[in-house]
């Protein structure tokens, strides 16, 4: 799994950078962190589908265990979005067992990531957050049901539907 971090996340956490080509990588994600109400809001977005994971109250020492945290959040968010375990099993079976990091170079994806952060921030400010968990499944499900448009609004889709189409491609092979 490869995560391209925004400058804010790189400054906050300072992970080891490893350049990698992720143009059509099913395991490529973008991540951004912002402070909200004295706590960190971490949003991780899948590059190909814009599928979003939301974490609130993340501490710096928890970022050292980011791989299991993201894997569990992926599983929970996918099942909460209506995926069956049979549909998502191949994705996790083929998933790399570690995370590499680099700085984001795609301004379009960073802009979409910022929009996902806005949506998550809005929902958490309106509906609140789960205090017993840093993973905010309700915010992830909300972000994954909103339409994302590309190509000057000629192509619009829900991130969960796009992620499902990639899972179907993965399941066919």
Where are these regions (language model features)?
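A short, conserved beta-strand element enriched in hydrophobic/aromatic residues
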Residues: 28-65
């Amino acid at each position: 799994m490869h995560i391209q971090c925004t400058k804010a996340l790189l400054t906050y956490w300072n992970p080891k950078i490893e350049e990698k080509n992720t143009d059509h990588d099913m395991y490529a994600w973008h991540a951004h962190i912002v402070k909200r109400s004295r706590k960190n809001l971490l949003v991780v977005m899948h590059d190909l589908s814009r599928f979003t994971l939301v974490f609130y109250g993340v501490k710096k020492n928890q970022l050292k265990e980011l791989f299991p945290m993201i894997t569990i959040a992926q599983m929970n968010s996918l099942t909460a979005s209506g995926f069956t375990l049979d549909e998502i099993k191949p994705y996790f079976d083929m998933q790399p067992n570690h995370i590499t990091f680099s700085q984001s170079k795609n301004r379009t994806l960073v802009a979409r990531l910022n929009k996902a952060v806005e949506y998550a921030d809005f929902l958490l400010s309106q509906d609140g957050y789960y205090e017993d968990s840093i993973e905010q499944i309700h915010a992830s499900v909300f972000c994954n049901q909103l339409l994302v448009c590309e190509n000057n609004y000629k192509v619009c889709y829900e991130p969960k539907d796009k992620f499902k189409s990639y899972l179907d491609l993965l399941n066919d092979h």
